[in-house]
Amino acid sequence: MSIPEMQWAQVAEQKGGPLIYKQIPVPKPGPDEILVKVRYSGVCHTDLHALKGDWPLPVKMPLVGGHEGAGVVVARGDLVTEFEIGDHAGLKWLNGSCLACEFCKQADEPLCPNASLSGYTVDGTFQQYAIGKATHASKLPKNVPLDAVAPVLCAGITVYKGLKESGVRPGQTVAIVGAGGGLGSLALQYAKAMGIRVVAIDGGEEKQAMCEQLGAEAYVDFTKTQDLVADVKAATPEGLGAHAVILLAVAEKPFQQAAEYVRSRGTVVAIGLPAGAFLRAPVFNTVVRMINIKGSYVGNRQDGVEAVDFFARGLIKAPFKTAPLQDLPKIFELMEQGKIAGRYVLEIPE
């Protein structure tokens, strides 16, 4: 398979951008790595944070962002046994980990202190050819469309793991904050596929229509409600609140409200990462109502296998729009304005 020396990529040369669409060298895989010809890459809010450099985590510069890449393996290192040339592969946020520390040994690879992160600490998938550790790349069934599966590689795995972390069971109710966004639209579907009832929280009629079409039993519009806490509780059985809350918002305020409408002995799971934000919960109520508050961060390798399997079996359809790689700056503008329903997937040029 012919591999060129140069390729097109979206490159940030300094924090805050601008993005420059230019040619850069094609990387060569190490002994335990694969080189993937990226056909599609989802766009995640994390990519915008990476560009801005506004998280308390050092970001590589210059940087090729992106961490939801789906494509074809075109080269592999001598030690790679998991992939053959021509296999379909997904490159995710967790590009690699040491596999030897306490966290890796107990299947918490995302917590590895030496983890490498696609599109953040190593170059990601907003380029024609990208590198990933073979042990962490996802093998994709060849009958699965690469454009449609791209958002599952981060958004899907992340929300699937969050639902597992919440402990919510079939027949119980989960409130999903940010249900009309890229993560939320997937969380809603995973929840429905797991037999969980959903109260969707977001803003706007377009997002309401999408959430209802995906199976939400109730929709609370934060731009219209006079009392969000009361409205969410009223939408749950017996008005007692949701058994779990999945926080996918990119603003701080929802993180201050969730403990007020979660059910006693319920669980609040923080997944969204608004820059500089803090969680807030009344200590008295948290104690006497036995509320659990926890974070959930992407997923391990097995979570990835399971999340992709839901998709491969037709249980999940990621709402997405396609755009060329050159349009990434415009997509970031729409993202900052909160005007994206579902997910954007970039088509990477051949």
Curated annotation (Swiss-Prot):
PROSITE patterns, alphabetized: ADH_ZINC (PS00059)
The enzyme's E.C. designation: 1.1.1.1
Cofactor: Zn(2+)
Signal peptide: none
Cofactor details (free text): Binds 2 Zn(2+) ions per subunit.
Subcellular location: Cytoplasm
UniProt-annotated binding residues for Zn(2+) 1: 44, 67, 154
UniProt binding sites for NAD(+): 178-184, 202, 207, 271-273, 343
GO MF assignments: alcohol dehydrogenase (NAD+) activity; zinc ion binding
One Pfam family from the record: ADH_zinc_N
InterPro entries assigned: ADH-like_C (IPR013149), ADH-like_N (IPR013154), ADH_Zn_CS (IPR002328), GroES-like_sf (IPR011032), NAD(P)-bd_dom_sf (IPR036291), PKS_ER (IPR020843)
Record flagged with keyword Magnesium: no
Similarity comment text for this entry: Belongs to the zinc-containing alcohol dehydrogenase family.
Quaternary structure, from the entry: Homotetramer.
The protein, known as: Alcohol dehydrogenase 1
Organism, as annotated: Aspergillus flavus (strain ATCC 200026 / FGSC A1120 / IAM 13836 / NRRL 3357 / JCM 12722 / SRRC 167)
Lineage of the organism: Eukaryota, Fungi, Dikarya, Ascomycota, Pezizomycotina
This protein's encoding gene: adh1
